[in-house]
Amino acid sequence: MRCGIVVNVTGPPPTIDRRYHDAVIVGLDNVVDKATRVHAAAWTKFLDDYLTRRPQRTGEDHCPLTHDDYRRFLAGKPDGVADFLAARGIRLPPGSPTDLTDDTVYGLQNLERQTFLQLLNTGVPEGKSIASFARRLQVAGVRVAAHTSHRNYGHTLDATGLAEVFAVFVDGAVTAELGLPAEPNPAGLIETAKRLGANPGRCVVIDSCQTGLRAGRNGGFALVIAVDAHGDAENLLSSGADAVVADLAAVTVGSGDAAISTIPDALQVYSQLKRLLTGRRPAVFLDFDGTLSDIVERPEAATLVDGAAEALRALAAQCPVAVISGRDLADVRNRVKVDGLWLAGSHGFELVAPDGSHHQNAAATAAIDGLAEAAAQLADALREIAGAVVEHKRFAVAVHYRNVADDSVDNLIAAVRRLGHAAGLRVTTGRKVVELRPDIAWDKGKALDWIGERLGPAEVGPDLRLPIYIGDDLTDEDAFDAVRFTGVGIVVRHNEHGDRRSAATFRLECPYTVCQFLSQLACDLQEAVQHDDPWTLVFHGYDPGQERLREALCAVGNGYLGSRGCAPESAESEAHYPGTYVAGVYNQLTDHIEGCTVDNESLVNLPNWLSLTFRIDGGAWFNVDTVELLSYRQTFDLRRATLTRSLRFRDAGGRVTTMTQERFASMNRPNLVALQTRIESENWSGTVDFRSLVDGGVHNTLVDRYRQLSSQHLTTAEIEVLADSVLLRTQTSQSGIAIAVAARSTLWRDGQRVDAQYRVARDTNRGGHDIQVTLSAGQSVTLEKVATIFTSRDAATLTAAISAQRCLGEAGRYAELCQQHVRAWARLWERCAIDLTGNTEELRLVRLHLLHLLQTISPHTAELDAGVPARGLNGEAYRGHVFWDALFVAPVLSLRMPKVARSLLDYRYRRLPAARRAAHRAGHLGAMYPWQSGSDGSEVSQQLHLNPRSGRWTPDPSDRAHHVGLAVAYNAWHYYQVTGDRQYLVDCGAELLVEIARFWVGLAKLDDSRGRYLIRGVIGPDEFHSGYPGNEYDGIDNNAYTNVMAVWVILRAMEALDLLPLTDRRHLIEKLGLTTQERDQWDDVSRRMFVPFHDGVISQFEGYSELAELDWDHYRHRYGNIQRLDRILEAEGDSVNNYQASKQADALMLLYLLSSDELIGLLARLGYRFAPTQIPGTVDYYLARTSDGSTLSAVVHAWVLARANRSNAMEYFRQVLRSDIADVQGGTTQEGIHLAAMAGSIDLLQRCYSGLELRDDRLVLSPQWPEALGPLEFPFVYRRHQLSLRISGRSATLTAESGDAEPIEVECRGHVQRLRCGHTIEVGCSR
């Protein structure tokens, strides 16, 4: 048997599709015939052998078995062998049912069955195939029955295994009892369908007999499939088969579509669709009948429902709209009188574009005459069926049976199918209609694709259309299939096919809700263009004093690398600083300062790939700082992550030139960056020389206060210049990381490569080309520069140089690479979007912050060994070190991209050995994570700090800030709460928590006089206070944040151990040598940790309230900006350690990480009474004593004020949003963005104003968003659910996308609901 070979089938193999088919009837006549012959042959062979072997006894007849003997004694009689033996005078004892010898009746029966089964495998091979196919149908939920004209076939079906797989059998005995005529009359098949509860028009017939196939065709069954293993396909097709297969394994069984009742309502879950539009522009396609019009008794009476014309008109003004109907095109145009639409008739065989141009399917025109003849024949054949309407259209014949009596419908459909089959036309079905069309591969889905190809690129970038198809009919399923992976299908619900299945993503209830949906979509699209585009950050005019700030704000990146938005023609200067950084590429240099040897590890500034300038007629090289600028505009497209610089200038010779540059760091190919430069001459003709280089002579000199330190991290470059490309190789001087940059520069005009002159340009550390081309006035030329950057740290890399060259060789042109990049960003925006309706400026800054977060930590980061650099990949402040900033970053990512958040935890887990060594050196068990780290997890905090106000170097004891470990533990537990991933706890999460908890238990020392555990000599989040007056660098005692969070970590470690399966828990305890005594001590510490208070306020640390009060007004009046109060006081010969003055939130961090209930519960465990009414006093106390010397301060203050519903929370939120764009830290943003503050602004929206918490395996919401600001919307993930949250004031709606995740519990201020996939709940909270 040939298995899986499709014979004589046009198009793909036949498919049993639950959208069109409810049941399958398998004809078994051939199987029964073959099995009966095999059964007779088995008995004949076995008994003839037995009678020959058996010794002759008196009265026994040993003659061979005859056909009459088989029929009388054995056919259909499992126990008939005893009667046969008696008739032959042979007497045998019954024996046992397990006998396998020939001296008992049972033995003979069993031995014969073995012979039968052996012959059956070769004689009836179809049996196993049919059984397997039937089981596939059952798994897919398709009802299945068997039909045969035979009687008494049970024993043969039992032997083939088929008796078990068919729930319904209709055989010759049943049809005889009912008086039904034999095949090819379809009566028997129709009775079988009836017993299955299926309509023949939605039922499939499968048979290998020509009479059975004819019966299927005569009965009007939806699909007739012939099984042919003997090359008789032509006869089977002529007998009525729609398709012929050699084996049922070739038939596809589809099961993935959903019942319409289970599909989410598009209006209720509109936010999901809106999210898809974050990075794409829609094109909307609609059916007419049942979608834009009500279903009516007479097709000619259909009209647009009220409001449809207005909705279509409004939507067409914002995006392409098409109506694709089964009606004739002229009919559609007459009923949809709205300008600006694509209109398609006859399922898209004929179309008219918005500009009036007419199109038709050329292949279909050959069928026009045949359709006309078919229409005439059908009119004649159906004239006796009352209510039947034959509608002849140019490219189809539709037979409507809405008004036909139920008992006549099957005959009508059968007649249409017979005629269509005979005429070579395609038969399709729809709402109370069966239709004949040209038998070519064309349907509404193909028409949708055809129109889509002619719409051109979407405004947001090439190939970023989102096709949306809305329809109600079975014929619309072709369109739903077309958009299944690239767009959105929306089915309009009706009951004429029951709760049928559909491939649509969403549903709408009726044409009126379709109008609501279209109007909502039009409104949203219109609103997006009415406002100043919140997807762009625009700088008008050139300002050298702000250029470095703009470079940081407009840096492009992809999680692997970041490249500052520097002018390509500019080298390092007071106004410009080219910088490119790859995550995790560090190098250490040594200096001698103030008699001390100082080692500093830095994120390395890599060779400048961007370097590009030009000159006209051999004049001066272009420099933005020296020409006369006539216009200048810089645009950062946040949606596309592309930076565009457009300028027009006049040079010393009076020549006016326009230059437009665009660049990106590919989110699709992380090692790739690209720059496109277009030069247009306005009033001159002459030569243009481009100089395109890769510059390896770069240093780390961005931060002024580091200039006294060594800055050259790269060795002398090796440069290889090729025809139109260059390869630069170098490595870091201490860490030995190989770096390769390959760049290709090509010139283009009107899509064609320009034949330009290339000359090598190179010196010690720079290499590339001078490229000359001639321009005439009004002409333009475009240089495309594509570069690839690799290091020896990259995975799956032979050498950095080979990889860079190979990647560059595979890279296409700029437009293609940019298109791939924009697509990747569209996918990211769909997962990470936040929408603030009507708040353009705030939304722009939120998107800027999201962009920089994703440019620093992206899905590519998950493939790297890299942490969260405090200043992103945008600059060199803090030397690119990893601090505790992941505490503000990871919770954002856990709820959006859990895999990326997991990679940040894995980064910390890989550095667990270093943290253990640090703890061991300090005399403790467990893990002590460093305050600052770079390449390997060692402590790399600076030993000396330069105060730029005083010019003095002072000791820097920041390595006492051990609370980084608390942040690591918090992120690990938050990740587990989001994902429910217990395997993470098994793999590494529990070990991480236990080792961090161990360290804090060891650091906490019992003070017998107080009966409390104390933690001494640390630095808290404040950072200002490194000690007490007179002991400036010894740390402070009992920092409240540290002590409380240490208890929190201990409890989470204990909980994590309890969550582990017994075997895994035992293995971990053995691995760590964790004793029962230790765990007892954990419990003791978690109940007796000391927490300082004064006057009902949580003290920042013990003794804080005894410090002097600062004259805040005096210092603000004298200095204005006092954010870095520590530097001001040190320059005055004073110390911030003397005062109740904090750099940033410290004690209030407890209210940032913990809910008030959690904090109060922890303090109660420790024996402290702390009431909710004490929280406002604590907040106010520290707000008045904080200089906000860190951008994180405003994040925490906004958080705690918003949770308390305080009116000034939004002031702090807006301060967070503007912290970098306004450079509120006084020039620090140019050194690198403040990544944690940017992430914090997102988290304020994502978790704070939503009240989103994860506690006790439950999602907790407590929305608190100012209603006047309009709705707040965003997607997130939780426990395998894809969720969308929409908040307005104190109410919210939460929608779960379709899927198979278990229901989740959602709590809102005491009220708990369960949310299932594909459903929406509303949470409204009483005041």
Swiss-Prot record:
A GO biological process held by the record: trehalose biosynthetic process
Pfam families in UniProt: Glyco_hydro_65C, Glyco_hydro_65m, Glyco_hydro_65N, Hydrolase, Trehalose_PPase
Active-site residues annotated for this sequence: E1023
Gene3D superfamilies according to UniProt: 1.50.10.10, Glycoside hydrolase, family 65, N-terminal domain, HAD superfamily/HAD-like, Maltose phosphorylase, domain 3, Putative phosphatase, domain 2, Trehalose-6-phosphate phosphatase related protein, domain 2
This protein's GO CC annotations: extracellular region; peptidoglycan-based cell wall; plasma membrane
Molecular function (Gene Ontology), one example: carbohydrate binding
Annotated signal sequence range: none
EC number per UniProt: 3.2.1.-
The protein's enzyme class: hydrolase
Keywords per UniProt: Glycosidase, Hydrolase
Sites where the protein binds substrate: W884, D885, K1143, Q1144
Family annotation (InterPro entries): 6-hairpin_glycosidase_sf, 6hp_glycosidase-like_sf, Gal_mutarotase_sf_dom, Glyco_hydro_65_C, Glyco_hydro_65_M, Glyco_hydro_65_N, Glyco_hydro_65_N_sf, HAD-like_sf
Induction details: A member of the dormancy regulon. Induced in response to reduced oxygen tension (hypoxia), low levels of nitric oxide (NO) and carbon monoxide (CO). It is hoped that this regulon will give insight into the latent, or dormant phase of infection.
Applications (biotechnology): This protein serves as an immunogenic antigen, inducing gamma-interferon responses in whole-blood cultures from M.tuberculosis-exposed adults in Uganda, The Gambia and South Africa, indicating this might be a good vaccine candidate.
Family according to the record: In the N-terminal section; belongs to the trehalose phosphatase family.
Name of the protein this chain belongs to: Uncharacterized glycosyl hydrolase Rv2006
Organism this protein belongs to: Mycobacterium tuberculosis (strain ATCC 25618 / H37Rv)
